[in-house]
Amino acid sequence: GLLVIARAAEGGMRDALSIADQCIAFCGNKVSARDIYGVLGGMDSSFLFTTADALINGDAALAVRSLDSVIEQGRDMGVFAADMAKHFRALLIAKLCGRSEDILSCTPDTMARYIEQASRCGETRLRSAVDALMDAVSGMRYLSLPRVRLESAFIRIASPDKAAEADA
């Protein structure tokens, strides 16, 4: 739980204390990582791994359904898009550097999951996924239909060969 708070605070002690106070106010004295993600509006890591699996396996439909689930839960699509961008960045770092808990500020178990998931995807595809998600994050702020931007990014990530054909 503390690692999640520290990551969300991005090194700011006051921000970390504020997040911790919010979590205690909403959840009481026993606060789990899932509770913290809920307070912050983000998704827990298992949901991100599942959505990334769908994208890596070429299942755009499942990834779009994941986005629909985020919306139904009242979560912020922008936060979800940013979380997915961070997740694919972690996969790219895992692919390039191997064990890199220090760079990613993650536990050894999470690092092992990143390495396993990254092993099923090429470096170029991971870079393209990070780029597509970062474009979606930046573009979503200015669109009246931000959902379409993120769905389009998911479809491009899930079907890289079809996206390349369309660009040709």
What are these regions (language model features)?
Residues 1-167:
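Extended, largely alpha-helical regulatory/partner-binding modules appended to the mid-to-C-terminal parts
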